[in-house]
C-alpha cells in the first residue's frame, strides 16, 4: 500500500519516529494547531479571514515582545544583586569591649628636654620674629635660657623655616628679630598665609606647605622637626623611664572590683604618649556585663596635669579615650574622644553587630584576598590596611618610613640624616593619598563582619567645689603626688552599657533564583496563560525552525545540482565522439552533488510485431511454477494450486 493510499485510508499521514516538516508553513500550522499557548490557534483558524489573521498575529507578537521586555527587567534586577537588610534585637550578657586611654602627651618634658631644647629655642625665635612673641611676658620660662641649648642643633633650620606667603606663594621679607620699625603681615588687611618650603634632593623642585592659621602651621612645622629628632634616637632610648601606670591612672575598677595588672597592656603612641588598653582579651579573661548602668562598668580616675606637657606639640589638656573591639587596633587620632580635666565623663554604649554579604552582592572582604601586608598586630581592619598601604608606598618611594606608623620589615624611619628630602616626598604622597590617587582605599575594602559601639557621652564637674579638698587630699596621699592645681589635674571616666539589648544587622539576597523563576512564571502566565511545558514547546519550535532551515537549504542545493546534471546530459546526446571526456567531467560534478550516474552503451532492441509473448508455464514437481523468458527463469514462490485464478488473470507479462 502506497503512502497516498495509507493517507486516504487513515485520513492522516503517519508521522515517522524521527522526521521534520518540509516547509515553514507546515511547521507553523502544526505548532499553532497543537500548542498550549493561548491565541496561536486563532492565527490558523482565521486564515480565511485575512483581517483576523493579521490582527491576531500582531496581538501575539506584541504580547510576546512585552513579556520578554518584562523578562529583561527581571533579569536586570536579578543581576544587580540587590540585598535586604535584616535587623534583630537580642538580649543577653555582653562581652565588655576594650577601652584605651592615653595621656595626650607623647613624653614628659623633663625626659626629652635635652633632645628638644634646641628645637624649642628656635621655635621661640620664630614666634618672636613672626608674631613678636615673648614667653617671659606670658609667665612661662624661655627654652633659650636653658643650658641644654648649647651645642649643635639636631635639625637644619636653613632648610625649612616658617614664612609668610602671599597668594602667589611669594615669601614675605618682613621683620627680623630685634627690628622695631618693621611691621608684620598680620597687621595688614591683605591676606597672607604661613607655611614652610619643601624641596627635592636636588633643590630644583620645591613647593610650600601652607596654612591659613599660624597655630596650625607652627604645630605641623614643629611636628615635622620633632620627627626628625626622635627618629634618630634608638627605640630603646625612646621608652620613658617614668612609665608606671600609677603616674597616669590613680584608680580603676570594673563592676565595683579593683583592676589588676593583668587587666591592661601598655603601648606608646607617637603623638598621645603612654596608652593603656583595658580588657584587651590577651592577658586575662575578657570582662562581661550582666547588668547595665554606670555603676556596672569601667571607672577610672586619671591624672591630667599639664606642667610636664610638651608646649609646642601637646596643645590639648586632659586625656583621650577610645572604645573598640578586642581584636582591633586602637586608632586614637581617628576615633578617640577627649576627656576634659576636672570633669567626670560618662560614656554609655550600645553594641551593634554588622554582617555584610561579599562576592557579587557587595564589595567587602574578610582580609584573605587583600594584597596589603598588615603592619598592625590585629585582625583585618580597613583603617589598618589603609595605613599599612600608605606606609608601604612611603617606604617604596621615599626610601624610609613615616614615624607615626609601624615599620615594615627591614625599613627605618625618615629623618634628615637618612633622607634630607623625605618631607618633600611625604607631603607629595600624602596629597595623593588623601585624593585616593594611590589606590589604597580601593585595595582596602570594608570588612564583611565587624562590631561597632554606639556611644553617648555625658559631662559633669568633678570633683564638686565642696568635695574637691578631701578628694584631692586622698588621691595625693594614695599616689604620693602633690596636687597643687586641685581638680585641674584630675579627671574621671565611666564606660558602661546603658542597656544589654544589642542590635544585629545582616544582609541577605533580596532577589534569588527562586524569586526570578517565580516572577518570570507569573509574567508568562499573565501574558499567555501557559505553563513550563509551553516553554518546552517554544524550545521545540526553535529547534524545528533550525532543522527545517537546514532541510530547505539542502533541497535547494540538490535541485541546483540536478538542474546542472540535466543540462549536461542533453549535451552528451549530441556529442558522441567526446562522450568519454564528458562522462569523466560529469562524474566529478555528480560526486559533488552526492549522486552517481552510470552510463552504458546498449544495442537497440530487435523489431518485433508485438511485445506480447506466449510463454508456456512449467510446473515443477514441488508445485512451483517457472516461466522461461529469454533464457532467464523467474520463480514464483507461491504454490500453483493455491493461486490458479490469479495466474490466469495475470495474463501475459509485459516488458
UniProtKB/Swiss-Prot annotation:
Family named by the database record: Belongs to the amiloride-sensitive sodium channel (TC 1.A.6) family. SCNN1A subfamily.
Its biological purpose: This is one of the three pore-forming subunits of the heterotrimeric epithelial sodium channel (ENaC), a critical regulator of sodium balance and fluid homeostasis. ENaC operates in epithelial tissues, where it mediates the electrodiffusion of sodium ions from extracellular fluid through the apical membrane of cells, with water following osmotically.
Gene label: scnn1a
Cleavable signal peptide: none
Protein name in the entry: Epithelial sodium channel subunit alpha
Annotated Gene3D superfamilies: Acid-sensing ion channels like domains, YojJ-like
Keywords: Cell membrane, Cell projection, Cilium, Cytoplasm, Cytoplasmic vesicle, Disulfide bond, Flagellum, Ion channel, Ion transport, Membrane, Sodium, Sodium channel, Sodium transport, Transmembrane, Transmembrane helix, Transport
Subcellular location: Apical cell membrane; Cell projection, Cilium; Cytoplasmic granule; Cytoplasm
Organism in which the protein naturally occurs: Neoceratodus forsteri
Alphabetized NCBIfam families for the sequence: ENaC
Membrane topology of this protein: Multi-pass membrane protein
Subunit details: Heterotrimer; containing an alpha/SCNN1A, a beta/SCNN1B and a gamma/SCNN1G subunit.
GO terms of biological process kind: sodium ion transmembrane transport
Ranges facing Extracellular side: 77-531
Annotated tissue distribution: Strongly expressed in gill, kidney and rectum (at protein level). More weakly expressed in muscle, brain, heart, liver and intestine.
